[in-house]
């Protein structure tokens, strides 16, 4: 989830919101159990191992990511907001490896895959099934007021940044995101790792994919 003060997988186009040198200072909330520390470090490590990004413990840096636990849910600012401490929160139910990676990639500078401006060619948003008040989670990037680039990477159904089909579903428990059948799109225009019985790519996966890695490295190409 994107922190609501800047709701904006596409990467920020402006260099203003990128972390200098691909270095992201961070600080972890005091008092977190060792298991939580390990999960955070493992998630940061997998990103570092495959991209140009480096997470460094905060010393004197003004801008940094504060990794915290509270009951408020899973959210992060997108990119470097240049306001000093910026929060990445992992609440109850958020302590899953893929979810942590998802939020870390928000902090790097990426929105959701299903909010790309070209998403309507690949998925259908069933707004009639979305929980009241949660519609903003499905807005296109351009509706957020900031510019994003896809870096000419094909639509990635398997992206760790793609919501699942039941995201923010109302009490009727019907899908909110419906992938188009592969027969309706060109396989050369998309990435996917699995297909369901109806011939639709599976979404909502929580593993870092080649497409995610490629997007990050293109955004921070000056530091690769």
Give residue spans per PLM region:
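Zinc-dependent metalloendopeptidases
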Residues: 1-224
